[in-house]
Structures are given as structure tokens and as C-alpha cells.
């Protein structure tokens, strides 16, 4: 596979402010990824860029599913970049941890019948995580970024960036969106994938609008 190329860009006004949307494409496969850029991201050597690698999740990002934390993480990351006035969000187009949308729906069906997110992937013949984060390092390079402050709970993203020559000088936690539909999913990511997920179940029951009917009875 040939290396990804920067092919298009334009202004993109959003509810979080004005971004530049930059399109990237593999010339042979035509596989596409995009980055949202705010502010002056030059000179990352002296001033590391606030960054988020966000893998595509149609159900969470666009359809507001509560089965995952993806949509919450997307909006929180864009808001934090906007508040900082400078940063990058790479929209990494590997839906369903790399298995695609239809297979993700199949995995959801297996989860409806008792499997966790990892068991469902394995039952369908996939690895727990099929994503390739190396392309994100290539995108950072094409944007002229060498040092980042990375918004993530996923150690694999940090490890891949460092191995590819992108210096992650700080990890910024992104623990948002926990609710009664995704607590088990988040537990699985923490226990089986090593994600840095912090639970405060009592607090999330009290704060989450979807959980008010399920506040545990205190003895």
C-alpha cells in the first residue's frame, strides 16, 4: 500500500468554532481520512499540539447511540480544542474498531445475547481491535506536527505514535459519557484492552440523565 497523501482542504464552521477540514487519501485504495484543524499548529516542537485520534463510529457520532462513549468523546474533544484555540482532531475512518459498520451491527447482535465487545469480535473471526493507527502518525507528519498532547484513554494510540516518531508529551484523559447502556463495554475495554478508564459508578448514576430510574438503593 502506498503512503497516504494530503489531497484537499476547506473551511468548516461547526458548533465548536471554525476549523479547517483537511482530506487525506491513499492513491491506490482511495481510502479516506480527515483532520479538523483549529488555529496555528506550526512550531509543535516548542508548543505541542492538543490532539485527538477519533476512530469513526457512525452509531455514536451521528446516531447518538448510548452503547459506547464515542459520540461523547468526539464532542468533548472538539470542545476542548476550541477552548484551547489550537489543535487537531484526526477522524480515523476505521468503523467498528476496523471491522466495518455491518460487522459492527453483527457484533452488537452477539452482545445483545450476552457476549462482551471483545468476545463478539472474536466470534466473528476478527481480532479484538483491527485498527491501524500508523496512518494517524503519517497524517500528523503531513500536518507538520511532531509533538502532541493526546486526548485519549487508549494506550495503543500512544504506543503507535511514539514508535512512529510522534512525541506524545502528555496524555489527557477523556472519561465521558458513561451510562447504564455502556458501563459493561467500558469495563471490558479497561480490563481486556488496558484502556485508562476511570469509573465512578455512584456519581454517574446520580449525574446521568439516562440512569435516574436505576439509582441503587443505599442501605
From Swiss-Prot:
Family: Belongs to the GTP cyclohydrolase II family.
Enzyme class: hydrolase
Cofactor comment: Binds 1 zinc ion per subunit.
Active site annotation, chain numbering: 129 (proton acceptor), 131 (nucleophile)
Name of this protein: GTP cyclohydrolase-2
GO terms under cellular component: cytosol
Residues where Zn(2+) binds: 57, 68, 70
BP GO annotations: riboflavin biosynthetic process
Cofactor(s) essential for the protein: Zn(2+)
CDD domains listed in its UniProt record: GTP_cyclohydro2 (cd00641)
Family matches, as Gene3D superfamilies: GTP cyclohydrolase II
Lineage: Bacteria, Pseudomonadati, Pseudomonadota, Gammaproteobacteria, Pasteurellales
GO molecular function, one term: GTP cyclohydrolase II activity
Catalysed reactions, semicolon-separated: GTP + 4 H2O = 2,5-diamino-6-hydroxy-4-(5-phosphoribosylamino)-pyrimidine + formate + 2 phosphate + 3 H(+)
Taxonomy, superkingdom: Bacteria
HAMAP family: RibA
EC number in record: 3.5.4.25
Pathways involved: Cofactor biosynthesis; riboflavin biosynthesis; 5-amino-6-(D-ribitylamino)uracil from GTP: step 1/4
Chain's role: Catalyzes the conversion of GTP to 2,5-diamino-6-ribosylamino-4(3H)-pyrimidinone 5'-phosphate (DARP), formate and pyrophosphate.
Binding site for GTP: 52-56, 73, 95-97, 117, 152, 157
InterPro entries recorded: GTP_cyclohydro_II, RibA, RibA-like_sf
Keywords: GTP-binding, Hydrolase, Metal-binding, Nucleotide-binding, Riboflavin biosynthesis, Zinc
Gene: ribA
Amino acid at each position: 500500500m502506498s503512503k497516504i497523501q494530503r489531497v484537499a482542504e476547506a473551511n468548516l464552521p461547526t458548533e465548536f468554532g471554525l476549523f479547517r477540514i483537511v482530506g487525506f487519501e491513499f492513491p491506490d485504495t482511495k481510502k479516506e481520512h480527515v483532520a479538523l484543524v483549529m488555529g496555528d499548529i506550526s512550531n509543535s516542537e516548542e508548543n505541542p499540539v492538543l490532539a485527538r485520534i477519533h476512530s469513526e463510529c457512525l452509531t455514536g457520532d451521528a446516531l447518538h447511540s448510548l452503547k459506547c462513549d464515542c459520540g461523547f468523546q468526539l464532542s468533548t474533544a472538539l470542545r476542548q480544542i476550541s477552548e484551547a484555540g489550537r489543535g487537531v482532531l484526526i477522524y480515523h475512518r476505521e468503523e467498528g474498531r476496523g471491522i466495518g459498520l455491518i460487522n459492527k451491527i453483527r457484533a452488537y447482535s452477539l452482545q445483545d445475547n450476552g457476549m462482551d465487545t471483545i468476545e463478539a469480535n472474536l466470534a466473528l473471526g476478527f481480532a479484538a481491535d483491527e485498527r491501524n493507527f500508523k496512518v494517524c502518525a503519517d497524517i500528523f507528519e503531513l500536518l507538520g506536527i511532531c509533538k502532541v498532547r493526546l486526548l485519549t484513554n487508549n494506550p495503543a494510540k500512544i504506543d503507535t505514535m511514539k514508535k512512529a516518531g510522534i512525541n506524545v508529551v502528555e496524555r489527557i484523559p477523556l472519561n465521558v459519557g458513561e451510562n447504564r447502556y455502556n458501563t459493561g463495554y467500558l469495563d471490558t475495554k479497561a480490563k481486556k484492552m488496558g484502556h485508562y478508564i476511570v469509573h465512578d459508578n455512584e456519581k454517574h448514576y446520580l449525574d446521568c440523565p439516562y440512569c435516574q430510574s436505576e439509582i441503587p438503593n443505599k442501605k
